[in-house]
């Protein structure tokens, strides 16, 4: 049994109740076999044992009072996974599905995603099983203030700089930042995704979706294809999906689907983004409302099944949304590229099937790195007490995403897996972190 296989078996036994973390670790570790074969220094320094174990796991209760005067208690998490190349960086997810395994999976992925950006940021993730949906502003504020009362003991601009994620938008970041400032009595860039009036960055809201398209465009061009004129299926209806749709349309593609937690829409004429923004960002309603704006569109209840014919698929909703059966439908319909806008939205089985069929596949740790890259750019602006223009940030973002594609493509080719961007992303992200860990000694 190889060193990698041995460590993977140990990891599975140690984390048996954390399937999401095991899935993420399996995908990364299996692709690193050729790296360990050619570089014995990684085994000699126990890199796998160290990189798969968080540097610190923080779990705490979050008590708050609802509008009826009743005390509610949620569970909060912060996993500070790896700081070899910079302070911990990763979002705070507020969703009922959040547990330690989910946060560890997200934090582990974040290590390599952050490494790929080329910026000095380590990997971390946090959140709570609190659900902001259906809560009043006062209840959300009460939760956020209680959450930050504990979390503030463990974070800081040069220690751990959290950001938003599912359920954590500008409102939640604002409440958390206010509480952090109140308790610590310091005004620093400790959270990213802040409001523009108090330290936020232009283009941060658009960054993940725009970055997804910049990398997809680079991948397609390198393989003799073009996003211009392509028919695109998008899942999700949050920031990533909305701004991926916006940039795809701007680049000349036609996006025909979007989906939320209750159903999905198909618009053969192309998604009306103004309608989507009004429904989702202004009215905060479900996609069922879309038909009121576009009567010729279709609304389907339930999970989006990727049955619509497309050239490019962009899963932008949540983990494991695209399964093996979905992959078969994409293949049958002639899809030639899939790029992950969400974190690990494609199951391992589906990923293998898509790659085996010859479909270009860009993994989330590379394809959706635009969000964290722009968060790091926000950190830079905060450190310098500067504010860059939208065009400046967007240009830096595009440059970062194109370089990510070049680096993962080169890494895959170097180790005999040309065109396998999953392997390339894992290797390129891993080597930078692993080499830094060795240079810093056993810590």
Question: What does each of the following model-derived ranges do?
Answer:
Residues 2-24, 219, 331-443:
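Adenosine-phosphate binding glycine-rich loop
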Residues 1-202, 432-440:
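N-terminal ligand-binding/catalytic initiation module
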Residues 159-163, 186-191, 257-260, 299, ...:
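General beta-strand structural signal in soluble alpha/beta enzymes
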Residues 103-107, 176, 212-220, 244, ...:
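Buried hydrophobic packing segments
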Residues 2, 16, 20-23, 27, ...:
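Conserved active-site and cofactor/substrate-binding residues in soluble primary-metabolism enzymes
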Residues 192-195, 200-309:
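Glycine-rich phosphate/diphosphate-binding loop of Rossmann-like nucleotide-binding domains
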Residues 12-16, 30-38, 108-112, 133, ...:
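Generic secondary-structure signature for well-ordered alpha-helical cores
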Residues 263-361, 366:
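Rossmann-like adenosine-cofactor binding region
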């Amino acid at each position: 049994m190889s060193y990698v296989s041995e460590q993977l078996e140990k990891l599975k036994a140690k984390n048996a109740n954390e399937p999401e973390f095991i899935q993420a670790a399996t995908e990364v570790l299996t692709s690193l076999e050729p790296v360990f074969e050619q570089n014995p220094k990684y085994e000699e320094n126990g890199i796998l044992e160290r990189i798969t174990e968080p540097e610190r796991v923080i779990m705490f209760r979050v008590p708050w009072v609802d509008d009826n005067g009743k005390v509610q208690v949620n569970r909060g998490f912060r996993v500070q996974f790896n700081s070899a190349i910079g302070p911990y960086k990763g979002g705070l997810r507020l969703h009922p599905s959040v547990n330690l395994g989910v946060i560890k999976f997200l934090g582990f992925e974040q290590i390599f995603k952050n490494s790929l950006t080329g910026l000095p940021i380590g990997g971390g993730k946090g959140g709570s099983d609190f659900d902001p949906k259906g809560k009043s502003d006062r209840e959300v504020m009460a939760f956020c203030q209680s959450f930050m009362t504990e979390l503030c003991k463990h974070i800081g601009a040069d220690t751990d700089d959290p950001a938003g994620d599912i359920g954590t938008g500008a409102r939640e970041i604002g409440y958390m930042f206010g509480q952090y400032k109140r308790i610590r009595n310091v005004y620093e860039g400790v959270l990213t995704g802040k409001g523009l009036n108090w330290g936020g960055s232009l283009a941060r809201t658009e960054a993940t979706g725009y970055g997804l398209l910049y990398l997809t465009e680079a991948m397609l061009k390198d393989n003799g294809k073009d996003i211009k004129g392509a028919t695109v299926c998008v899942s999700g209806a949050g920031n990533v999906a909305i701004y991926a749709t916006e940039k795809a349309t701007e680049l000349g593609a036609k996006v025909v689907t979007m989906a939320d937690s209750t159903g999905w829409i198909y618009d053969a004429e192309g998604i009306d983004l103004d309608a989507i923004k009004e429904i989702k960002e202004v009215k905060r309603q479900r996609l069922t409302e879309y038909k009121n704006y576009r009567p010729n569109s279709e609304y389907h209840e339930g999970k989006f099944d990727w049955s619509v014919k497309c050239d490019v698929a962009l899963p932008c909703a949540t983990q494991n949304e695209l399964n093996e059966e979905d992959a078969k439908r994409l293949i049958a319909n002639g899809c030639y590229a899939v790029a992950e806008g969400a974190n690990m939205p494609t199951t391992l089985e589906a990923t293998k099937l898509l790659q085996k069929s010859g479909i270009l596949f860009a993994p989330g740790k590379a394809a959706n790195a635009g969000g964290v890259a722009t968060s790091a750019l926000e950190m830079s602006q905060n450190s310098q007490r500067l504010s860059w223009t939208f065009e400046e940030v967007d240009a830096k973002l595009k440059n970062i995403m194109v370089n990510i594609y070049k680096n993962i493509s080169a890494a895959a080719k170097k180790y005999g897996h040309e065109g396998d961007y999953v392997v390339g992303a894992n290797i390129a992200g891993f080597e930078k972190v692993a080499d830094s860990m060795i240079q810093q000694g056993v810590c």
